[in-house]
Every structure is written in C-alpha cells, then in structure tokens.
Amino acid sequence: FASAGPETLCGAELVDALQFVCGDRGFYFNKPTGYGSSSRRAPQTGIVDECCFRSCDLRRLEMYCAPLKPAKAARSVRAQR
C-alpha cells in the first residue's frame, strides 16, 4: 500500500489506511473546521468524498490525522484519573 499511487479506498480499507498513516494519533472523517480557505466557499467534504468517491494518496490521508498531543498533556490526563 505505501508504495502505491493514488487509489480509491472505501470502508474497512479506508479505515485500515488511516490507521496505518496516523498510527496512535487517531484520525477524523471530516477535516477540522477552519481547514484551509476553501472551506468557507465549498460545503465540507470528508475523507469518503476524497478517497472513496475519488482517489487520494498518502499525503491526502495524512490531512485527516489527529494532531499529535504533547507528552506532558498526556501524562497529566492520566494522573487525574
């Protein structure tokens, strides 16, 4: 998969690809709000629109990964539980 060019990914294949690309960070099916200037003009598109109905590459998949959380924040959350 990693060496493949743009292809369509749907359902479980799409989820597997996102898990592969994003790892422990997790991912979103819709881009976070305020993403890019085009989001104001066009209706919000999700990963299914971009990668299942059309083809997408690894760089496009990475746009849906959740941001990395700082290690300190992760530790303090665990300490509170």
UniProtKB/Swiss-Prot annotation:
Family, similarity comment: Belongs to the insulin family.
InterPro entries: IGF-I (IPR022341), Insulin-like (IPR016179), Insulin-like_growth_factor (IPR022350), Insulin-like_sf (IPR036438), Insulin_CS (IPR022353), Insulin_family (IPR022352)
Biological process annotations from GO: cell population proliferation; insulin-like growth factor receptor signaling pathway; negative regulation of apoptotic process; negative regulation of release of cytochrome c from mitochondria; negative regulation of smooth muscle cell apoptotic process; positive regulation of cell population proliferation; positive regulation of D-glucose import; positive regulation of glycogen biosynthetic process
Cell location: Secreted
Pfam families from the UniProt entry: Insulin
Organism: Suncus murinus (Asian house shrew)
Region of interest: C: 34-45
One cellular-component annotation, GO: extracellular space
Gene name for this UniProt entry: IGF1
Region (D): 67-74
Function: The insulin-like growth factors, isolated from plasma, are structurally and functionally related to insulin but have a much higher growth-promoting activity. May be a physiological regulator of [1-14C]-2-deoxy-D-glucose (2DG) transport and glycogen synthesis in osteoblasts. Stimulates glucose transport in bone-derived osteoblastic (PyMS) cells and is effective at much lower concentrations than insulin, not only regarding glycogen and DNA synthesis but also with regard to enhancing glucose uptake. May play a role in synapse maturation.
MF term (GO), any: insulin-like growth factor receptor binding
Principal location class: secreted
Region (B): 5-33
Protein name: Insulin-like growth factor 1
Assigned keywords, A-Z: Disulfide bond, Growth factor, Secreted
Propeptide stretch(es), residue numbers: 1-4, 75-81
